[in-house]
């Protein structure tokens, strides 16, 4: 009976990034050393979401990075939660290519906190669709999994209303 209870209510779990044993109270089920490596973005470019480094002598608020400054985009704003580094790469690649679909829940939790922090209001959640070929090969759409979890957490409707027509090359692997 104890083994059954340990399975349902485990005392310790593993870090979703490095598999190190942790307490289930750890933030996002990530160990302290991996969590320290996650660089949460405070000030980001309004267009690409990359961090903007502010200097103490700057008096005016900079909204765009040097790359995006004076470029036209087909959207108003982009927000990034965390810098892409070795630790966050393991989360993304684990979800996309190693069938670790449970990671979508943790990504959605991080996104929820950023949305609340930035006081962002919205009516619907959409996700970027995969081409049918890629969806058949992978078996799931990671963006849809994240969007589904985010929709549940923030109680905002998820819409599946756009489709991908063009097959594009993979960015990784």
How would you label these PLM feature ranges?
Residues 1-173:
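Glycine-rich phosphate/pyrophosphate-handling loop used in enzymes and phosphotransfer proteins
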């Amino acid at each position: 009976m104890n083994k059954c209870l340990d399975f349902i209510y485990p005392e310790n779990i593993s870090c979703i990034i490095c598999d190190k044993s942790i307490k289930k109270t750890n933030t996002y089920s990530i160990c302290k050393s991996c969590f320290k490596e996650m660089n949460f973005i405070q000030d980001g470019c309004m267009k690409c979401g990359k961090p903007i480094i502010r200097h103490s002598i700057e008096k005016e608020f900079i909204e765009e990075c040097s790359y995006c400054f004076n470029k036209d985009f087909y959207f108003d704003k982009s927000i990034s939660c965390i810098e892409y580094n070795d630790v966050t790469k393991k989360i993304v690649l684990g979800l996309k290519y190693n069938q670790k679909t449970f990671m979508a829940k943790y990504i959605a939790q991080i996104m929820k906190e950023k949305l609340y922090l930035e006081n962002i209001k919205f009516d619907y959640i959409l996700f970027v669709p995969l081409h049918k070929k890629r969806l058949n090969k992978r078996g799931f759409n990671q963006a849809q999994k994240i969007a589904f979890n985010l929709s549940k957490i923030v109680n905002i409707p998820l819409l599946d209303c756009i489709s991908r027509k063009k097959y594009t090359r993979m960015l990784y692997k």
